[in-house]
């Protein structure tokens, strides 16, 4: 058990969500999320039931950190990857080329192109906090205890206990494919039809050629032309100097 690899995931209890949106504010502040964009959501499922047995459900929502993430398959530069040490799906901002192919590949629609950087962005579970032993900002700020985060493989973790003791457990499947989301809803059924989850839209087979090979060839060709131009200019200068003598 001591050598077991960590598997981080989220456990959500919608019954405890009061729609205060403190998690959204904390996420934005922690990760410098641009205005008009967000890494996490709280969806209002509306009034349910019939009078006098009425209820209202709020559903916290963000990246599922899937076991089989289509976004990883879609990324031509391998900027999006699943960390082998803990299972979190993250984006290497240095490697991202901003092609946007990962956006439609995500069936949960949790990605966006950051207008400030031109790169893909999404929830990374506040990796900078997790690596310091702290919970993601949204979890640490959740006043109702609706959002939980931890090692799903650790029997002593809060998420493991919550799943074991839950009255019901549900994950949100993508359409037509099992992505293996590490994002669990407990104790209160969630209607995924209201969340607009779709099938992943993977890029065409020539995406790598179009976004990686061709730009690389053009860059190399451009460098070659510049080199030839510099050499030609030097020859002209040399010729003029010899002529002056």
Q: Which residues are covered by each model-predicted region?
A:
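Non-ligating segments of multi-cofactor redox enzymes
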Residues: 1-245
